[in-house]
Amino acid sequence: MNDNPVNLKGLETIYSFSKKNKQSLPPVEKWNPPFCGDIDMKILRNGKWFYMGSEIKRPAMVKLFSSILRLDEDACYYLVTPVEKVRIQVEDAPFVAVSLNKVEISSKTGYLFKTNLNEEILLSKENPLTIKIGENSEPSPYILIRKNLHALLSRSVFYELVDLAEEKIVDDKTCLVIESMGECFNIHEVEKE
């Protein structure tokens, strides 16, 4: 870890960009600045952001940092500006899906998730659901937010989704499946007694 404090020099540029383009995100995938070290910033599994051991409580600041977050091929998370890149720690996923709504779009039923940062994501082919089974055999459900950044579904949202799912045969197995925007997403194989 780099003990020198890192100054995110490009942050003011990002802030002005995000104020002008509320729906757009900075093009962090196009930026290739030098790596400037690690900073003491961490995103907990519950979606709370901490800097130097203190929770960042200003939603606008968390949203700003999340807009410049990138997951690179080395499986590390970085905050990226045009002039520098710093590594942060993420316990699980950087976002948490905290609510779920059923929607009708172009005569198709879909499910709209809202994250802890008020981003809305439609469960679809572009934003699929994935389930990872942990060492404790507990499922961890995720929805793709953008590029390779995911939101962990909160326990209550996952239970709500399971309640909405239907049993279907998938590859000769009975599974709980949720259909959204014409796509089927396998939640879990149903164990028959």
Question: Each PLM stretch: what is its role?
Answer:
Residues M1-E193:
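Long, non-globular segments of proteins
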